[in-house]
Amino acid sequence: MKSRLRILSILLSLLVVQGCVIIGYRNHFSRDLTPEQQSKVVWNTPDERLLSLKNDGRIFAINGKQMQKMVQPHPKAIVYQWSPHCTSEACLSLSAIQTLCDNNGITLFVVADYFHDAFSQNQILTYPLFIANEKHYKTDVCHKLEKRFYIDLLGEETYNATKEISWYRYAYFEKGKFVRYIRDPYVELDNR
């Protein structure tokens, strides 16, 4: 009986590892983009300021310090870590979160987890869609890329103090300063 359990646990472990390999836990798959999609991705240099951007259908690969500069001039802002295929209640559609932010005087910045399906939904947003710059951070592994991006955005001390709840997906800022993560924007933001 023990050997059967051991074999079963090994098989289950292999399935999980196999799933990780298939899924890849790779972030953007930028190498898999079509030439047309590649032409719509702007790989900015780390020191480039993006304050005057409007949504023209392109996706901007940026780092956390650049996002921090973009958030600063706005009285209220949210950085939404958006995953195109997330089915959780915590993952609002781009149109829903943009409307909610517009109705509550909040500037919305969306950072996509990956490129897949991001191009088709980019038009909904006031600002262009962003993605963490895998070239700047020299990795396309999801958890490493997100960690480096959010350390740059929040600062290492704040990141470490909040990493237990960072999966909430919505980082809320006032006057350029990180205030908190938001779990449910409808409950915590809707002032109607």
Question: How should these model regions be labeled?
Answer:
Residues 1-8:
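Bacterial N-terminal signal peptides that target proteins for export
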Residues 16-19:
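C-terminal motif of bacterial Sec signal peptides marking the signal peptidase cleavage site
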Residues 24-70:
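N-terminal "domain-start" segment that seeds a small globular fold
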Residues 68-96, 109:
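Short active-site neighborhood of thiol/selenol oxidoreductases, capturing the structured segment around
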Residues 88-90, 118-120, 180-181:
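Extracytoplasmic/secreted cell-surface and envelope-processing proteins
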Residues 96-103:
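Catalytic-core regions built around general acid/base machinery
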Residues 109-149:
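Conserved segment of the thioredoxin-like fold in thiol-based oxidoreductases
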Residues 141-192:
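Thiol/disulfide oxidoreductase modules built on the thioredoxin-like
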